[in-house]
């Protein structure tokens, strides 16, 4: 069964979060899976494992939203591709650990298409610039994509965020994923000049390859 892809543009975080919860609560075994592709206005989100103290420099212009996904604190804002994966894992025949691995692989494959070598870090969900990547040394090991999920009754929501041309200064206000000193980078800083639409399309293709049975 294919997934319905929705391009939502720039969407308020709180209302999108409520819509994800409502969709997941209302869905049945016959409900079509959906993939939402969007950007958010600036917002910090704090996951279930989060410590509000990891927002060490609060901003009056950027709100903090407590959410029910796994993980710690992160930032969303314009120039970041956010993909929410509303999937029936039972129907796909996978568990959450496998889902995480497949999402990570889709991001790694996408970045490779644009000349950035990236990798997983055990125990720290997300994608990081690898030593094999031809980038300035200060960006080796920097986080370029975040991942956080919630699974309810075998159905997932939340998803991933890939930094393309993001306000990296906002990340300096937090300890990303709870790690003090963790650098965050975007594709533009690494010299990738392709536009958001091109990168988004490629990411979507890799996600569908990994997650949607042919």
Curated annotation (Swiss-Prot):
Q: EC number(s) per UniProt?
A: 2.3.1.181
Where, subcellularly, is it found? Answer: Cytoplasm
Protein name in the entry:
Octanoyltransferase
Q: Which family does it belong to?
A: Belongs to the LipB family.
Its catalytic activity?
A: octanoyl-[ACP] + L-lysyl-[protein] = N(6)-octanoyl-L-lysyl-[protein] + holo-[ACP] + H(+)
Please name the top-level EC class of this enzyme.
transferase
Keywords assigned by UniProt, alphabetized: Acyltransferase, Cytoplasm, Transferase
Domain of life of the native organism: Bacteria
Q: Name one GO biological process term.
A: protein modification process
Q: What remark does the entry add?
A: In the reaction, the free carboxyl group of octanoic acid is attached via an amide linkage to the epsilon-amino group of a specific lysine residue of lipoyl domains of lipoate-dependent enzymes.
Pathway where this protein functions: Protein modification; protein lipoylation via endogenous pathway; protein N(6)-(lipoyl)lysine from octanoyl-[acyl-carrier-protein]: step 1/2
PANTHER family in the cross-refs: LIPOYLTRANSFERASE 2, MITOCHONDRIAL-RELATED (PTHR10993:SF7), OCTANOYLTRANSFERASE (PTHR10993)
Q: Where is the active site?
A: 177
Q: What are the annotated GO cellular component locations?
A: cytoplasm
Positions contributing to substrate binding: 69-76, 146-148, 159-161
Q: Which residues form the BPL/LPL catalytic domain?
A: 29-214
Q: Where is this site: Lowers pKa of active site Cys?
A: 143
- What is the first-listed, main subcellular location in coarse terms? cytoplasm
Iron-sulfur found in the keyword field:
no
Q: What does this protein do?
A: Catalyzes the transfer of endogenously produced octanoic acid from octanoyl-acyl-carrier-protein onto the lipoyl domains of lipoate-dependent enzymes. Lipoyl-ACP can also act as a substrate although octanoyl-ACP is likely to be the physiological substrate.
Q: Which GO terms describe its molecular function?
A: lipoyl(octanoyl) transferase activity
């Amino acid at each position: 069964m294919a997934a319905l892809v929705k391009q939502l543009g720039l969407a308020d975080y709180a209302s999108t979060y409520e819509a994800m919860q409502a969709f997941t609560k209302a869905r049945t075994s016959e409900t079509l899976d959906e993939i939402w592709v969007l950007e958010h206005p600036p917002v910090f989100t704090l996951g279930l494992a989060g410590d509000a103290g990891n927002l060490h420099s609060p901003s009056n212009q950027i709100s903090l939203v407590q959410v029910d996904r796994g993980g710690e604190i992160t930032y969303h804002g314009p120039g970041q591709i956010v993909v929410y994966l509303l999937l029936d894992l039972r129907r796909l025949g996978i568990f959450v650990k496998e889902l995480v691995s497949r999402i990570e692989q889709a991001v790694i494959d996408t970045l490779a298409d644009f000349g950035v070598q990236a990798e997983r870090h055990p125990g720290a969900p997300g994608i990081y610039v690898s030593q094999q990547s031809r980038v300035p040394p200060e960006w080796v090991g920097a986080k370029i994509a975040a991942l956080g999920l919630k699974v309810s009754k075998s159905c997932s929501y939340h998803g991933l965020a890939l930094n393309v041309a993001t306000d990296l200064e906002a990340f300096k206000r937090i300890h990303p994923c709870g790690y003090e000193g963790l650098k965050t980078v975007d594709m533009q800083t690494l010299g990738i000049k392709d536009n958001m639409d091109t990168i988004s399309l490629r990411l979507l293709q890799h996600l569908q390859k990994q997650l949607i049975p042919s």
